[in-house]
């Protein structure tokens, strides 16, 4: 089965409010709670998650909560005030009263979080008990993919929240990833020829959303304030302004805002809001230094999303490797190289340069420190493109770099899915020890 660029954007790119993992848990809880009688009083709520959902949802702040975090809070908010029809923007209507009620549930010990330590792949199950009723929902494979809902043990057969099995987003995403793995870079680039006005408008929407996050981060300096600090250092003339620095500033400022729980949506890429920031914002930063037109920038962003999806097909949706660095970073450097007039060879060289530079960066969960990693990924994406256009490219004799971009990406996928299994377990072990240590 072949896919179009419109299919890729539809499956891989979507708005998300707050970090994607807590949003997915909130969505699952909201879907389950929607089956209960109106105004039912929640007596118990159980959340079961795979290790990577647990890792990425442990420390990141939740929008609309004035600095609260945790998957238990996300689930409670989703069940109390979430709107499952809004998918990953499920918490967009949460208010202070909902937060107060969620805190009470947690304080009273009514929320239980269980880690499914041996589960492979993205998985969330929420069970809500209220009076004589028990409702449940399951999200799996993709953050917004609700595969099951049931009330009192009876599966819900018809719901607008559950896609028909024959056309489920999960199945389409799996087919897309399998299809992408068989493509070369030239084919990926050819997909851009099919971008229409509707697609360009959607790409513009994503750019606008992510720029709002960057602008907020620059103005207010939430979280660690990495973007605002870089901007201040530049204004103090302690570091020099160039396109690399501007890319770092935009990406990190947006990450500062998003990881601090600012109530603004991000346009995600490959299921991750931070991937979306990395895939889009460096291209915007570079554009103002060039004479290229606005549509060319949007097409470069389109290529970035395509390449990000291509790399993620090999590395997996969640792993011990920082996808913002190697997947969205690859997308960004492809887009930047394209915008600068590079050909397929230049783009392949740029991506290989970036992978050689960033392949070792681990994912130790979503949190404020991700702003540093997005800063690094964005700056390296621009630098890798500039190097490639100057004829600098990593040789195939070096480490995991292969003779082609496709082989290099396969090698990176093997590193991510096979080589980093124990790394992921160790990261999670350290995080769990911190979370439950009496110190």
Curated annotation (Swiss-Prot):
<dbReference type="GO" id="GO:0080146">
    <property type="term" value="F:L-cysteine desulfhydrase activity"/>
</dbReference>
<dbReference type="InterPro" id="IPR021144">
    <property type="entry name" value="UPF0597"/>
</dbReference>
<dbReference type="InterPro" id="IPR005130">
    <property type="entry name" value="Ser_deHydtase-like_asu"/>
</dbReference>
<dbReference type="Pfam" id="PF03313">
    <property type="entry name" value="SDH_alpha"/>
</dbReference>
<comment type="similarity">
    <text>Belongs to the UPF0597 family.</text>
</comment>
<protein>
    <recommendedName>
        <fullName>UPF0597 protein Dalk_4447</fullName>
    </recommendedName>
</protein>
<dbReference type="GO" id="GO:0019450">
    <property type="term" value="P:L-cysteine catabolic process to pyruvate"/>
</dbReference>
